[in-house]
Amino acid sequence: MSKVTPQPKIGFVSLGCPKNLVDSERILTELRTEGYDVVPSYDDADMVIVNTCGFIDSAVQESLEAIGEALNENGKVIVTGCLGAKEDQIREVHPKVLEITGPHSYEQVLEHVHHYVPKPKHNPFLSLVPEQGVKLTPRHYAYLKISEGCNHRCTFCIIPSMRGDLVSRPIGEVLSEAKRLVDAGVKEILVISQDTSAYGVDVKHRTGFHNGEPVKTSMVSLCEQLSKLGIWTRLHYVYPYPHVDDVIPLMAEGKILPYLDIPLQHASPRILKLMKRPGSVDRQLARIKQWREICPELTLRSTFIVGFPSETEEDFQMLLDFLKEARLDRVGCFKYSPVEGADANALPDQVPEEVKEERWNRFMQLQQQISAERLQEKVGREILVIIDEVDEEGAIGRSMADAPEIDGAVYLNGETNVKPGDILRVKVEHADEYDLWGSRV
């Protein structure tokens, strides 16, 4: 009787943003297709892959620590991802790393794995990989990456130097992936990229094909097509181009979720110019007003940076004034920190850490108040909620206004007869600064 050769085992660590998560899913899918077993522990693995983040200093530190832990626990480590674009920095701290590749270098990663842990003799029918691929998210939602890279040159950001200029995926390929996800039971698709609203710019919005039908390569056409799948579609990382106005009617018609994640970064024209970001705050406020008139249910999420080099109290006050007027629903705020390779590092008048901290606290205090007031308006109303978790105490879900992991939650105490992915109608009974509580209707 022939001896069964055990499958080679690969440990995997995925750090950073959802875009990195999608890269990890692609590598894992290829490994599983080739017959490798992916395991959760280092000591049981023949090798470990660490997919790193290198966007800000804290992310770099986390990545370096993860590499160090993998080396200590296992010894055979391949590094990929954004920090991989800075090989010298990794080698200086961890010279024993076997191989280093940059972001979206899937083929290189697989070649390195084949070199150190040869490909098994694999019968694909013994270990079927799901058609939608290996996913690191719960079964009921998934990220759909539509492009790679970015054409902007924001002075605080090094993404273009790590991931290159914008490269849009063919729209037929994107829509086919979306269909596979829905067929596999996904109820919510989160559209991501470095710059979602620029989708198709690099190919001059050429016409592609899906199911034999012509489809324009653009964000608006993509949203129109995704709306036909009968699931929740959520847009992330939307740069405030003029054509963003065109997706708001789709939200008002219920074709995609009335949710827009649009990083604005600041509200002082002077600071925005230093950041190389769009600078007309009055125009942005007018657009927000218009969007809400067209789609009253619209949820606006944004992120901002406080303590950017040379930011004065007057600049910061402009930001607070903008918050008061815009009354955004979901807001993240970061204290500026220098990122190696970013142009902003060379700007004069760096803001002291204690000033950054004080401004961040004032910013968050104001936004918490706004968020609490916005959520209080929902008390007594009925909303749709998608369930994420269920235990003996009840269920936790999200409304259309909440993206996974970054926004709030809806708590349904005592509601145990549901499962993740169920979409319920819920009456809101209570709210705080970030979350809602309610009961099933």
Curated annotation (Swiss-Prot):
Residues 8-118 form the MTTase N-terminal domain. GO terms for biological process: tRNA modification. Residues 136-373 form the Radical SAM core domain. PROSITE patterns: MTTASE_N, MTTASE_RADICAL, RADICAL_SAM, TRAM. Gene3D superfamilies: Methylthiotransferase, N-terminal domain, Nucleic acid-binding proteins, tm_1862 like domain. Its cofactor is [4Fe-4S] cluster. SMART domains: Elp3. Its EC number is 2.8.4.4. [4Fe-4S] cluster 2 binds at residues 150, 154, 157. [4Fe-4S] cluster 1 binds at residues 17, 53, 82. GO terms for cellular component: cytosol. GO terms for molecular function: 4 iron, 4 sulfur cluster binding; aspartic acid methylthiotransferase activity; metal ion binding; protein methylthiotransferase activity. It comes from the Bacteria. Binds 2 [4Fe-4S] clusters. One cluster is coordinated with 3 cysteines and an exchangeable S-adenosyl-L-methionine. Keywords: 4Fe-4S, Cytoplasm, Iron, Iron-sulfur, Metal-binding, S-adenosyl-L-methionine, Transferase. It is found in: Cytoplasm. It catalyses: L-aspartate(89)-[ribosomal protein uS12]-hydrogen + (sulfur carrier)-SH + AH2 + 2 S-adenosyl-L-methionine = 3-methylsulfanyl-L-aspartate(89)-[ribosomal protein uS12]-hydrogen + (sulfur carrier)-H + 5'-deoxyadenosine + L-methionine + A + S-adenosyl-L-homocysteine + 2 H(+). Catalyzes the methylthiolation of an aspartic acid residue of ribosomal protein uS12. Belongs to the methylthiotransferase family. RimO subfamily. This is Ribosomal protein uS12 methylthiotransferase RimO. It comes from Shigella sonnei (strain Ss046).
